[in-house]
Structure formats: structure tokens, C-alpha cells
């Protein structure tokens, strides 16, 4: 089907229902009131304000401003105008005057930024109203990105549907009582815009035509890519699309051991590539760190290829570019962000392509704090550099519906080379993975996400978010200091500590004079939100607990609010005598209707986006203080966690919150769980790759496997990707042997098996390892590949 050209709507979009007009006027001025009446008669809501004091960041739904500059208000009007433009809004602004003349107007500060002047009495209110309404409508049109705008226009045409989906505008639902509830809850628009590709007005989402491809082109321009592809089933699919477009069976892939399971599945199981694993850091709080800096060394990487048992041709280690693809988590779940420029200097010449998995970021292209940390903003990419992919989970911290993802492709600098993957071949991989029945509102959310980041607006949105994150960390640091001095004993001298430096030094900054050993919370917010040195993981610093870094190599993400719970000494990384496992606090917060993103051993993660405001963050702080008060009086567990207690009444009868934390902390300490977790991602613990991951998965499909208790898996080949979720990072990979090197991995899972039995109600999700209840206890089982007596795989 050939789509029609992108067209203007045949039915006017009802901007009068979507935007309002704000009038900052003297309510006693009859001519001004007549102007307002004329605008209201044209269907627009008009909000009257008496002055210019409102926070313009809350005015995203304003279609035009009318502002009086009489009566000494000219200076305030100028400040207001600057505030609107500074946050990136291009909202029409009309200056309303009566006695001021042309010579009174400041051409530089005023006339250059306003859309027009209203002189009451010179033209009729009806005429001025038409001008203002017209400017609001035109502004509304300018806000509509290609696909979303086309979808609104299509909806306005009220086409009669005899195609998919079967609910046909929601009318099927309205035929039944349950369906009526469903229809009314979501509202008619979502159903009317759940469209079918049988009508080509909106273009083809799979072969990229019409408004669909225009939306993706606009996103590419805004994010800095050569091409962008919208993906509607998550970054798990985006990663598989890239992996299967680039990799063949037997290709070498440089593989971050922190990679999400989707890259194991796409690159290793589906494509059949051979991984060269990169060791990664964990700190004692259970947080995910970066690849060891030393692991990027070319000599180390070539040696690993030579030593790999699945690489039969050892000369591959000598190839100019031995790696077809590198797969790297640009930002870890816990907020470690790589300096992309530094990593590219180390491995760029060794790889045909680099895939940067940006599932947990995506805003790094829009704020100067992240300079050097965005692959789409790298400069001077030459023909000797690798092609770049970024995969982004727009739904995680962007403005996208759940499962909204996108792939950015930046490789025109290698166009014409044999390693180049042109669009047509790339799209064949995309077609293998995406649905032929896309959900149009989901696609539109990706279109709008790009639009809201266009121009200055993207930076301003994230600037405010970063600022709020800084302020809440400063507030929390104040509580830390308070309780350290006011607590009656060590078990009360604590509070939830934000994961930022205690003290920092800054030198040669464009944003600050030199600082020496200054408390982080004492540094001005305007400096903190601009200066990378305030967020870097210094190699020698103790506060972060990571090892193996280089100067400037990584920084902490300001939009990941991570709070540490007691139990670990930040200076030494060793267990303390008492502790509060983060899972207890996470369960408490959920009881209080505050939902954290995740928890690990002794850390809580809260995602920050431009959606945040003071009310949410102050409520979070209040709930944390409430938990501290419950802790200090050692409240009954039934009061702190009523749901967990009710489900496990017999187990926790008579328990207080301190008692359950004491037992759980002692268990984790005695089992050495933090050290087991760290070892799972170190080179010395990587098991023997007995067979390729793809071969192990084929054994699982063919049922050439045994289902055994994990304690009996020693020496056997794993047939599954085993992991704890979150964060969904593979601990042992299909094809790896549960050998002696893998003992930390086995002991890590067995520690969780025991914790599930000891502490019901505080379980984590496990995948690739399965929970069976035997004789009243949970026991972990897993699938292992069936081998013949001579070590060959059964067929």
C-alpha cells in the first residue's frame, strides 16, 4: 500500500478544548474585559491573573498570554517574558497597552519576543480576539509532531471502521456491562485512536512511510542520530533487533557482563555469537558498577580471544577489528554512567559496531552535565570509528507509554564499507521482531517524547529535574547529620544516606572557583547541576565502594536517587554489627503507597523524571522519617508491615521491626552475600563456556536436559540464563558449566533459597532457577544439559 502524502486535517483540531489563554489584566478595565469576552465567545477558556507571579513551568497548557504592561508592570512583564522563553516555551505573548507608545517600547527586550501588541481602543476587541485566538491555534499546530498530529486529524474525520481492531472505536465494549466500565474508565479517545494499518493515512509503521517515518526522522534529528526506529515492545526487543541485524553465528561480541538478559538472548542465543566477557564491579551495598577500566586494554582483550575455548581459529585474536559488535550498558540500573568518549578511545578501533544500551538513561543528550556521556552527541566520527547504536527505554524515564522504546542508528560515517549495515538490511531484522498490529497511541507517545525534548525545552525539563534531585539529597543529608548527633545509641544514629560524595574537590571548573574537600551538600545547587566533578566516581574515593576505575571514567546519574540503608561501613565496605536490609524499607514504603523502583541488599532506588515536584519528594522524605520513628521505638512488625505480617502471621508473631532486621542482616552477613554477589561478576568466577549459549538453548528446546536441584548441579552445563530480578542481569549463562569457578554463583542462589525459607514475604524474583515447594520448604531447581558418558551432548 502506498500512503498518501502527509496532509493537513480536513476537520479542525479542537485546540479550544486543549489549550487555554491566560490574561494578566486589570479586572476593572472594561475594554480588557470585553476582549476576554470575545475570546470566550470563540470557545477558549480564559484564566484571569492579577499579576506576573505565577510559576510559568506550570503553564504547559497555555496557548497564548495577554499581559498588561501599564501601571508600572512593564518590568514585571519583561521578567515574565524571559521566564517563558528560558524554559523553552514558544507560547504566543501579546503585550496589552493603553497609554504607552512606540517610543516607550524596548525593542531589544520586549518587541523581539512578543507576538504582537494590543492597544485598547485602537482596534476592536473582536479583531484583537481573532488575532490572539489565531496565534493560539497556530501555536497548537506547531506543537503537534508528525504522527501524533496526523492521528488527531484522522480521529477528527470520524471514519467508519470495518477493519481491525475488533472493538472498532470501543463500541464492542459498550455492548456489555463489563465492557462499559472498561470504555468509560479509559475514555473514548484511546479506543478511537487504536487504529489499523488497513487505512494508510498515517503511513506504514513497518516499512517506514508517511507520518510514521516523518516522526522517526524528527526523533533522529532531535536525538542526534542518522536514523531512529520506534519499537513498541520494549528495549528487550530493540536489543534483539540490533543483535540480529549485525551478528552471525560465530561472530565475536565484546560483552559487558552487566548486560540485560535481552542481549544474552539476542546476541548469544538467537544470533549465536561468541562472547568475550568484560568483568564488572559491585559495591558492598549491592549496587551495579562499571566494567573494570583495565579490561578495555587491547592486549587483554586479544589475549581473552586467544584463550577462549569456543574460538577454534586463534588467529582471530590478531584481526584488525576482531569484534563484530560490542554490547555495553551505557548506564547501569543503579546509575553508573560511562564516559563514552573515553571508552571509544580504548575499543573503537577494535569493533565494527558498538551497541550502547541506554535503557536506563536517554536524557544524556539534553543536558550539559552529561557532556561526553552520549554516543549520539560524539563529535568527529571518522571512517575508522565504529558504527553506533543506542537503544533507549523511553518508558523508563522518558515520556513514553510502557514498552515504548527506540533504536538510534549513527553509522553514515562508515557508509560504503563492507561492515556497514544499511537501512534495508537492518529493517529485515526489525520485521522479524515487531508486531504487524502496532498500537498507534504507543507509537504516538514516542513521537511526542521527541517533540517535548526539541530545542531548549529538553534541557530545561531535565535541568529542573536535576535541581529537585539535588535539593532532596541536601535535605536528606541534613537528616543524616541530625540523627548522627541526636541518636541515643549507634542503632539510632543513622538516616537514609543519599549515594553522592561526602566531600569533593573541584578544580579548573567553568562553573565554580576551586573547591577543596567541601561537603557535597554545601556546594551551591547551580554548581552541582553543571559540574561533572561533583558526580564522578574518583578512583581513590571511598564513598562509592567501587574498585578498578580511572579518572573521569564514570559518574553517578543525578536522576537516580539512591538511598543507602544502614549495615555497611562506607569507608571499608565491611558489614556493621546492625543493619536494615533495604527490602524491609521497600515493603514499608509500598504499604505507605510510595513505590520505589527497586531495592538491593542495602540500597533503595527512586527514579527521577521531569514529572517530579516538591509535593512528591517531600512526601517521600516524610515517609522515611516516619519509618525512622517506628524504628527508634522498635514498633511491632504488624504495625510497620501489616500486609507481610498478615500473610505470615505464624512466622512473625511477636516480632518487632528491629528483630526482623537483626535476623535478616545477620543472615546476609554470615552468608557473605555481598561478597558472593561481587564475585559473580568477576573474571575469576566466570565459568568454563563448555558449549555455545545457542547450543545449550537448543538442548533445552529438544528436552535433552535434566531438571535437578541446584545443589546437585555442580559440574553440569546450565541450559538456562539464571538471574535475580531486578535487575535482570544474567548470573550464569546457557552453556556455562556450574564448575568450581562458578561456586560463588551457586552459593549466591543458594543463599537466596535459604533466605526465602527463613524470611517469607521478602522474596525476590528468580528466573532460570525455579522454586519448588518440597516438604514445606522452597528448593531451587534448574535445567542442565544432558551429557553422554564421553562428554558429548545428547541428541
Q: What is each of the regions a protein language model found here?
A:
Residues 60-66, 114-118, 226, 251, ...:
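Conserved acidic residues
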Residues 23-30, 50-51, 66-71, 96-100, ...:
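Structural motif
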Residues 177-270, 276:
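Long, structured ligand/cofactor-binding scaffold of large enzymes
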Residues 19-22, 228, 253, 326:
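Conserved hydrophobic helix-helix packing surfaces used for dimerization/oligomerization
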Residues 2-19, 40-43, 53-65, 75-78, ...:
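Non-catalytic terminal extensions of PLP-dependent enzymes
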Residues 9-30, 35-40, 44-48, 268:
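Conserved acidic segment of CheY-like receiver
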Residues 28-35, 74, 100-106, 262-263:
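Short, charged/polar "capping" segments at the starts of alpha-helices
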Residues 47-52, 57, 78-90, 105-107, ...:
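Conserved PLP-enzyme active-site core in the AAT-like
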